[in-house]
A protein has these predicted regions:
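N-terminal redox-cofactor-binding region of secreted/periplasmic oxidoreductases
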Residues: 2-617
Length: 617
């Protein structure tokens, strides 16, 4: 990779960043000093908050305040391939979970780092942009858990309103000019048909067609080569409305109640200015699955013993606030290939890639590095098409110890290495974690314990995904590109399977035999020392379990901490109080099968309608 390419990359990125920052604050809705009273106060300008602020402010007679803790997002958040570059910066809460008991042994202090967006657009601005509506059974499960009115059939009108489709595979560019999808705010981009890794993955899946197997090509929230999430589709077009105020760099502290009716919101601006903003109608919490339960508990809504122990005034006892946390875990399985069809660092930083992106809105940078996903029962495999990656960036983001990272990603220093990763996951994990307070001060970090792999079901489910990956790689489409799986060798797992040692036994015996027989000929030396490609057998389940407990990491989908049916009712109203609703992923009673972001957009559309139709008392 030439110095010229690097220089051009840095220069273009720098200029783009300056331009983005210069014009980010031209909208009149951004304010620094709020008025004392609003009709609606929305906490959190994430995926749901952007939709709600846009829809509720459509009525010019109401005043809406959107409170966001973060500041404007940087330019890199707009480039689909560089989404992770925004993580662990000023626009990421970078939640550090508690040391895990059953997983994360390959991470420093067994501590997962969970990215959470901080700024307009929230996590939708730093995620991998992947679109999907889950599976119909996901919503039926919600109903069985007591969250009524949110089935797939209930949400279809809102998915159509937001996306113009109810399909998980879709391209907005194919919309007729007068079609429903052309009018929809959200835009989708389907991976190109000529993407070879996607085609190979799809062919292999078809070759091993089995019951309850579903393949989906990658679809992303992308428009004209740029990230296009709810901030772009909903909030940005509304930012010149006089009745909409957006307050950045402002943290919501707690809600004040009078006779169990929400009357105001305490806020902290720039970490120093405390203020109290009054509300006429409702406060809607859209702060995410960590911050929303934190605000509730600081407001006196949550487990009685915890609230009392922190000397917070108890408003209502609800043991479910902060419980039921669920997340997907991903186990990365590196596969090397011999055909140059994956995304590598050398390709990403080439001059041609930069020209493709900045002049044509196309190329490697214009789409997230995911080819597709295959579901089989409760397991799934995602094909992540990066053959090489930055060790420093990924290791810092995941919190891997250096040795573990280098063993898991063996070609981290080869910028031209061709390959990909299968991410093995369980789409309906049963392990449940918690979010709780350590102190009544917001300056003290909240305690987040995902409790990953606590349930044996999750282990068995992920093992099935790994076995599926093994079988897929034996199919002709993958064999033709020389696909070869790499099994890491973490020290903790060698007890269960030390394949390298077994493969080398024969070579060691031959060398010892030659030593006793005198000096070998040159030809004999060549025959002995010439490495042979080991035939690695399939590892035992015990090794796979050890491996996932060592290197599996968050899927970035934490949810469920204010579960529907437990903390909120079917109208998203917080139980036993009035004037407070919740609309974010914290209301999910159980996981959505993989990507939740598009689901949240549709749910927020319905939530806005529910709020608008609520009679004013």
């Amino acid at each position: 990779m030439s110095i010229f390419s690097y220089t051009i990359s840095i220069l273009v990125a720098f200029v783009s960043y300056i331009v983005y920052q210069k014009y980010a604050n031209v909208y009149t809705s951004f304010i620094t000093k709020p008025v004392k009273r609003y009709d609606y106060i929305i906490v959190g300008a994430g995926t749901a908050g952007c939709v709600l602020a846009s829809r509720l402010s459509e009525d010019p007679k109401v005043k809406v305040l959107l409170v966001e803790a973060g500041d404007h997002m940087g330019y890199f958040s707009k480039v689909p391939l560089t989404s992770t570059a925004s993580q662990q910066g000023s626009n990421d809460w970078s939640v550090r979970a508690t040391p895990q008991k059953y997983s994360s042994f390959g991470l420093w202090n067994q501590t997962p780092i969970i990215p959470r967006g901080k700024g307009p657009g929230g996590s939708g601005q730093i995620n991998f942009l992947l679109h999907g509506f889950g599976l119909p059974e996901d919503y039926n499960r919600w109903s069985r858990l007591g969250f009524k009115g949110w089935t797939m059939d209930d949400l279809k009108p809102y998915f159509l309103k937001a996306f113009g489709t109810v399909r998980s595979e879709f391209d907005s560019d194919s919309c007729p000019a007068k079609g429903v999808c052309a009018k929809a705010p959200m835009k989708l981009k389907l991976i190109h048909e000529d993407n070879e890794l996607m085609s190979i993955f799809k062919q292999a899946s078809s070759a091993l067609a089995a019951k309850n197997t579903l393949f989906r090509k990658a679809t992303a929230n992308v428009k004209d080569g740029s990230r296009y999430q709810s901030y772009d589709a909903y909030l940005k077009p509304a930012l010149k409305r006089k009745n909409l105020h957006v307050l950045l760099k402002t943290q919501a502290i707690s809600i004040r109640f009078e006779e169990e009716k929400a009357t105001s919101l305490y806020i902290l601006q720039d970490h120093r200015n405390l203020d109290n903003i009054f509300v006429n109608r409702e406060i809607i919490l859209s702060a995410g699955s960590v911050k929303t339960p934190q605000i509730l508990m600081l407001s006196g809504i949550g487990p009685r013993n915890l609230i009392k122990s922190l000397q917070i005034n108890l408003i209502t006892d609800n043991e479910w606030v902060g419980r039921n946390l669920h997340d997907h875990m991903n186990l990365p399985i590196y596969v090397s290939i011999k055909k140059p069809i994956s995304v590598t660092l050398a390709k990403v930083f080439s001059a041609s890639t930069l020209v493709d992106y900045f002049w044509n809105n196309s190329g490697y940078l214009a789409f997230p590095p995911v080819a597709g996903v295959e579901y089989q029962n409760a397991s799934a495999l995602m094909l992540f098409s990066m053959g090489s990656s930055s060790e420093r960036l990924l290791r810092d983001l995941s919190n891997y110890r250096p040795k573990v990272f280098r063993d898991t990603f063996p070609f981290h220093n080869d910028t031209s290495k061709e390959g990909f990763m299968f991410l093995a996951t369980c789409i309906q994990p049963k392990s449940r974690g918690t979010v709780t307070l350590r102190d009544s001060s917001t300056s003290v970090p909240i305690v987040v314990d995902p409790n990953y792999l606590n349930r044996e079901y999750d282990v068995k489910c992920m093992i099935k995904a790994i076995r599926r990956a093994e079988r897929l790689l034996t199919t002709k489409p993958f064999e033709e590109i020389g696909a070869r799986i790499h099994w890491p060798r973490p020290e903790r797992c060698l007890t269960f399977w030390n394949y390298t040692k077994l493969d080398q036994k024969g070579l060691v015996r031959r060398r010892k035999k030659m030593k006793t027989q005198g000096a070998p000929s040159v030809q004999a030396q060549k025959e002995v020392t010439k490495p042979t490609k080991p035939k690695i057998q399939s590892p035992p389940n015990e090794y796979l379990e050890c491996l996932m407990r060592e290197v599996a990491v968050t899927g970035h989908h934490i949810a469920g901490t204010c579960a529907g049916g437990k903390v909120v009712d079917s109208q998203l109203r917080v139980k036993n109080v009035s004037g407070v609703r919740i609309m974010d992923a914290s209301v999910f009673p159980a996981p959505i099968s993989l990507y939740p972001n598009s689901v949240i957009v549709g749910m927020a559309e319905k939530a806005a309608e529910l709020i608008k139709n609520t009679p004013r008392l």
